[in-house]
Regions:
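C-terminal alpha-helical "lid/dimerization" subdomain adjacent to the S-adenosyl-L-methionine
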Residues: 276-331
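Short amphipathic alpha-helical interaction segments
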Residues: 57-68
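Conserved adenosyl
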Residues: 103, 114-251, 256-258, 276
Length: 354
């Protein structure tokens, strides 16, 4: 048999391609975290020495990084002037925060989530998982960045529009909206900006997230109809809300069923629960598309493992398909579950009523 036709050749070719992508993300993360892309966008082409002088970074490292990024197709390189430059068409993807095309968050998530590798190997051998305190801060920055893009360009311009009663009541005002697991508050802030007559409350388990959310809200000029509070969703609230939302929360929870019980108690009998989670199939073998490997990798490195680290259910990133949503809703007393058709490639949205 001709060696060029061996099946091993195809696998080797795939591995080489995957390796190129892996190192590409690492080099991109350097450009994002050190602000090199931002400098090139703002100040224009530069030699490695000019860039070093502008940014107070080491020239030799910048030279190697720049050539690597050129070889990957992220930067242009002029062989005569020896200057690297960033195509202006790439600025919305690599530089702009919260833009519709921004991928800064994805880059940071991918790079940082892969760091606790040996702890993950230990979990394979002994069970358990990686706790939240082992997760690199770059991961949280990435989550914030992707949330900024997603909620600014999908939540208030697409998803809410497809729930007319929700939108109408929020516009009329005098209603309350609770965002459970609000993280850095991007979703809550966008809703509060869009519907100034209604009152919004963001709850999150982690105090640093609440502090960050408060600062982002302050910078956005949103304060009169918005409040953030540290709170564990496993502890029931005495207050009830007209609307409750969870965005990418339930599949991460240690005890998702108990969390759903808390949510049901928090929603008024004539209220609506808006659930957004990862778009996935009832049979995980049916999940298809370019982002599916990313979902399983994130599950191993964050979603599933952090739950298992706390003796949780470990649903994982693709652990909340529509059938599981309906199962939980039935168990906790929600009566209707309506899937909202959206254009987002990664998320499903459900309008759920008592």
């Amino acid at each position: 048999m001709d060696d060029n036709n061996l099946p091993q050749k195809d696998l080797i070719k795939k591995i080489v391609g995957d390796a190129r992508g892996a190192v590409g993300i690492r080099l991109c993360a350097i450009g994002v975290d050190l602000g090199i892309f931002e400098d090139l966008a703002k100040n224009g082409p530069a030699t490695s020495q000019e860039l070093a002088d502008r940014m107070n970074l080491d020239e030799r490292y910048l030279r190697e990084w720049g050539l690597g990024m050129f070889s990957l197709g992220y930067l242009d390189f002029d062989k005569v002037s020896r200057k690297i430059s960033l195509n202006k068409e790439f600025i919305p993807v690599l530089v702009e925060e919260g833009g519709k095309f921004s991928q800064k968050g994805l880059i940071e998530i991918l790079n940082s989530s892969l760091l606790p590798y040996h702890e993950l190997l230990n979990s394979f051998k002994n069970g358990g998982g990686i706790n939240y305190d082992k997760i690199d801060k770059g991961f949280w920055n990435g989550i914030d960045q992707t949330g900024c893009t997603r909620y600014r360009h999908f939540l208030v311009t697409d998803w809410v529009d497809k729930m007319p009663e929700l939108k109408s009541r929020l516009e009329t005002g005098s209603v309350t909206f609770a965002d459970f697991g609000c993280g850095s508050g991007r979703s809550t802030i966008e809703m509060a900006k869009k519907f100034p007559k209604s009152q919004f409350f963001g709850f999150d388990l982690f105090e640093p997230n609440i502090e960050r959310a408060q600062n982002i809200a302050l910078d956005a000029g949103v304060k009169n109809n918005l409040k953030f509070m540290q709170w564990d969703v496993s502890n029931p609230l005495t207050e009830k809300f007209d609307f409750v939302a969870c965005f990418d929360l339930i599949h991460d929870m240690i005890d998702p069923l108990e969390g759903m019980k808390t949510i049901r108690k928090a929603v008024k009998d004539d209220g609506i629960f808006v659930l957004m989670d990862i778009k996935c199939e009832d049979d995980p073998a049916d999940n298809e598309g370019p982002m599916v490997p990313f979902m399983y990798a994130m599950s191993l490195h964050f979603c599933m493992t952090t739950s298992l680290a706390n003796n949780g259910a470990g649903l994982g990133t693709v652990g909340l398909p529509e059938a599981k949503v309906k199962e939980y809703c039935d168990l906790v007393g929600f009566k209707t579950v309506k899937r909202i058709e959206t254009d987002h490639p990664l998320n499903s949205v459900f309008e759920i009523r008592p």
